[in-house]
UniProtKB/Swiss-Prot annotation:
Xref: InterPro entries: PRC_barrel-like_sf, PRC_RimM, RimM, RimM_N, RimM_N_sf, Transl_B-barrel_sf
Entry's localization field: Cytoplasm
Cellular component GO terms held in the UniProt record: cytoplasm; ribosome
Residues spanning the membrane: none
Job description of the protein: An accessory protein needed during the final step in the assembly of 30S ribosomal subunit, possibly for assembly of the head region. Essential for efficient processing of 16S rRNA. May be needed both before and after RbfA during the maturation of 16S rRNA. It has affinity for free ribosomal 30S subunits but not for 70S ribosomes.
Self-association state and partner proteins as the record states: Binds ribosomal protein uS19.
Name assigned to this protein: Ribosome maturation factor RimM
Native organism: Thermosipho africanus (strain TCF52B)
Annotated PANTHER family: RIBOSOME MATURATION FACTOR RIMM
Notes on the domains: The PRC barrel domain binds ribosomal protein uS19.
Length: 178
């Protein structure tokens, strides 16, 4: 028996969120969390969780097509706009083992969130709280304590080592923090 949301989502990763309805035939806008289109374009069976309603369900993708910076998704059995509205705001999860393998210097955000961040001298700076996509490069948000954050660009100038397996990142402290 599943007792907690953590158990329910164990082994799964959020890859998108369902936005507003599209048209009158039960379609929804799908906004990816990933820059790997093959992940989204290969969706078949998905897990949906809506944080507001606390509803979790399994759905089958009937149709998916690319629009302007987002996708239009049609779920099997959702035939009209009224039914589709129930899914707005739901996160789309897949099993982690469905993700494509990455090269050594690539990472999925979930692999580095929670990593300990250490400077060159061995001083612990904090823990990665989130990863922000800026367009030119990713930026890790390092939670120093409950009130202070450090933003570090994920570029070779600042990242010395990024060890996904051991959740440890060694960084060169940015000059603006000295």
């Amino acid at each position: 028996m599943i007792n907690t949301l953590r158990e329910l989502l164990s082994g799964k990763v959020a890859v998108a969120i369902l936005g507003k309805t599209h048209g009158l035939k039960g379609e929804l806008k799908l906004h990816p969390f990933t820059n790997f289109p093959e992940i989204i374009e290969s969706l078949e069976e998905i897990f949906l969780y809506n944080e507001k309603t606390k509803q979790f369900m399994v759905a089958t993708v009937e149709n998916l097509r690319l629009a302007d910076g987002y996708y239009i998704i049609k779920l099997n059995g959702v035939e009209n706009v009224e039914n589709a509205r129930k899914f707005v705001g739901s996160k789309v999860y897949i099993n982690k083992d469905e993700l494509p393998n990455l090269s050594k210097d690539e990472y999925y955000f979930f692999e580095i969130v929670g990593s300990q961040v250490i400077d060159e001298s061995g001083k612990v700076l904090g823990v990665v709280d989130e990863v922000i996509q800026t367009g030119s490069n990713d930026v890790i948000v390092v939670n120093k304590n409950k009130e202070d954050e450090i933003l570090i660009p994920v570029i070779y100038d600042y990242i010395i080592t990024l060890d996904k397996e051991n959740k440890k990142i060694v960084v060169k402290v940015p000059e603006w923090l000295d």
